[in-house]
Amino acid sequence: MKIAVLGDSDTVLGFRLAGVHEAYAFEETPLDIERLKNKLNELIEREDVGIILITERLAEKVEIPDVKLPIILQVPDKSGSKLGEKALREIVRRAIGVELKR
């Protein structure tokens, strides 16, 4: 099974250097988001792809389907993880009833 990466150019470069051959770079332009959607659907349909890694930032721009295989995981990009920050804000909001904002 192959691993595929969908992300910004820096993230993709890092994964290519780590040996991932199926790595595709996208910007956040409308044209690239459309290309991203098409590539994600193409990778999901392929039987030789077992894991798809997509940066959190790009994952926010597309609908991630709920499929058993391939496994689709969100990874942070060079700006860091947003998921941990969101989870922490929700915990604080529930605990003290106040939403924290930057």
From Swiss-Prot:
CC annotations in GO: membrane; plasma membrane
Bilayer topology annotation: Peripheral membrane protein
Biological process annotations from GO: proton motive force-driven plasma membrane ATP synthesis
Chief place of localization: membrane
Family to which the UniProt record says this protein belongs: Belongs to the V-ATPase F subunit family.
HAMAP family, sorted: ATP_synth_F_arch
Protein name, UniProt field: A-type ATP synthase subunit F
Organism: Thermococcus kodakarensis (strain ATCC BAA-918 / JCM 12380 / KOD1)
Source taxonomy: Archaea, Methanobacteriati, Methanobacteriota, Thermococci, Thermococcales
